[in-house]
């Protein structure tokens, strides 16, 4: 069994297990001024699946390009799927999930989907590297919405007021182990 894992910054990884290529999130083409990651979405030659954590730009932005160029299937929450469909990804390449679904990716590779919680970077500071962050950042839903409404320095359209559709986590498994 051959396995390789490459990191492309933020939360984007390329996982290859034997002949199956899986992208975990799809954010390769950076906003202006950000350093490049060594690969653009247009340069991706092969992908079988895209597993997207939620519908924020830094997870989903290049899913349409990668799916369009490679024929990859996008597995994501319903908001991510809606945005991908609006961007022109064909329905037969879209697999909406919400958590609990086991999905066969290859003969000896499957993924289990889990619902998750997304942290809020507008919560008033980052925790120390050795401090656990378990999701309770003492910020109310109303405070979070108000802080996100400001938009900060993000270009228009990169953050939706509709939210992220709910965060998802993925566990990939085969007979040798899991990641």
Across the structure, where does each feature detected by a protein language model lie?
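Short gly/pro-enriched beta-turn/loop segments at secondary-structure junctions
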Residues: 163-167, 174-177
